[in-house]
């Protein structure tokens, strides 16, 4: 569980903002491992935006990389458009995640980032961040850790799509989502899916009908309870086993 922190609101242009020192998800984000002086320097370059409404985009494919975005609340999906003009979802980003890493190599975003619900983000100008990280080893190391985590996630996704059947894919998706909620201090057993079943199917390479059928099967087996977008994990051992993990949902 992420310990509760006293939230200090300071007036900025545009209203109230939570600073890095007071953010409850800082352990998952860039500020982790930074000392107070380093936090102050990072805090000074961050722009805190107004809420992003459902359906709005942070950036589009082809846009020049100007900033990275740290999600404070809400859910952002990343997707590309195939040669056939179809949407292909490549990731779902939760509070504490950083969006935009995949643009560092070319200097342009290869994908779109769109809010699935009302979300709050911190905008971090990349050139300034890159310059600052050159002067702060702790910041540079944390950036590398975050990028390494994203690469590991991509590798896991390749394995998921190439080696697992439909049941195992969906079980792994729900299991991994529950672990991510746990890391953020939320319940790993009861949560709301912010993405549609169509989005989940798109991400996993399955049809909407297959997702609905499998959720019904998981519920009938007693592994899950499903009510609309709300999921309750009833048998964490069974879910972990089907997902290819041995540890219980914490």
Curated annotation (Swiss-Prot):
Region (Dimerization): 140-159
Location of the region described as Activating region 2B in the Swiss-Prot/TrEMBL record: 123-124
SUPFAM superfamilies noted in UniProt: cAMP-binding domain-like (SSF51206), Winged helix' DNA-binding domain (SSF46785)
Activating region 3C, as annotated region: 85-87
Recorded GO CC terms: cytosol; protein-DNA complex
Positions of the UniProt region annotated as Activating region 1A: 71-75
UniProt-annotated stretches for the region Activating region 1C: 181-191
InterPro entries: cNMP-bd_dom, cNMP-bd_dom_sf, Env_Response_Regulators, HTH_CRP, RmlC-like_jellyroll, Tscrpt_reg_HTH_Crp-type_CS, WH-like_DNA-bd_sf, WH_DNA-bd_sf
Span list, region Activating region 1B: 116-121
Keywords for this protein: 4Fe-4S, Activator, Cytoplasm, DNA-binding, Iron, Iron-sulfur, Metal-binding, Repressor, Transcription, Transcription regulation
Region (Activating region 3B): 81
HTH crp-type domain location: 164-237
Predominant subcellular localization, coarse grouping: cytoplasm
GO BP: positive regulation of DNA-templated transcription
Cofactor: [4Fe-4S] cluster
Region (Essential for the oxygen-regulated activity): 20-29
GO molecular function: 4 iron, 4 sulfur cluster binding; DNA-binding transcription activator activity; DNA-binding transcription factor activity; metal ion binding; transcription cis-regulatory region binding
Cofactor binding summary note: Binds 1 [4Fe-4S] cluster per subunit.
Subcellular location: Cytoplasm
Location of region: Activating region 3D: 112
Annotated region described as Activating region 2C, given as residue ranges: 127-128
Function: Global transcription factor that controls the expression of over 100 target genes in response to anoxia. It facilitates the adaptation to anaerobic growth conditions by regulating the expression of gene products that are involved in anaerobic energy metabolism. When the terminal electron acceptor, O(2), is no longer available, it represses the synthesis of enzymes involved in aerobic respiration and increases the synthesis of enzymes required for anaerobic respiration.
Quaternary data: Homodimer.
Name this polypeptide is given: Fumarate and nitrate reduction regulatory protein
């Amino acid at each position: 569980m992420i310990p509760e922190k006293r939230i200090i609101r300071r007036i900025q242009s545009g209203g109230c903002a939570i600073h890095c020192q007071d953010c409850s998800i800082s352990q998952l984000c860039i500020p982790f491992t930074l000392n107070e002086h380093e936090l102050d320097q990072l805090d000074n370059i961050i722009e805190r935006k107004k809420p992003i409404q459902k359906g709005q985009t942070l950036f589009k494919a082809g846009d020049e990389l100007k900033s990275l975005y740290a999600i404070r609340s809400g859910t952002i999906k990343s997707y590309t458009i195939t040669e056939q003009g179809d949407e292909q979802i490549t990731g779902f980003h939760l509070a504490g995640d950083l969006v935009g890493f995949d643009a560092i190599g070319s200097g342009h975003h290869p994908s779109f980032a769109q809010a699935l619900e009302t979300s709050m983000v911190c905008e971090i100008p990349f050139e300034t961040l890159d310059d600052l990280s050159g002067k702060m080893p702790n910041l540079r190391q944390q950036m590398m850790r975050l990028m390494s985590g994203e690469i590991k996630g991509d590798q896991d996704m390749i394995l998921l799509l190439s080696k697992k059947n439909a049941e195992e894919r969906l079980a792994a998706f729900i299991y991994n989502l529950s672990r991510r909620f746990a890391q953020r201090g939320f319940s790993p057993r009861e949560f709301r899916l912010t993405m549609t079943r169509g989005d989940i199917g798109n991400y996993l390479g399955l049809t909407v009908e297959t997702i609905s059928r499998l959720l019904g099967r998981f519920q009938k087996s007693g592994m899950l309870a499903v009510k609309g977008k709300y999921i309750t994990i009833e048998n964490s051992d069974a879910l972990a086993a089907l997902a290819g993990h041995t540890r219980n949902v914490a």
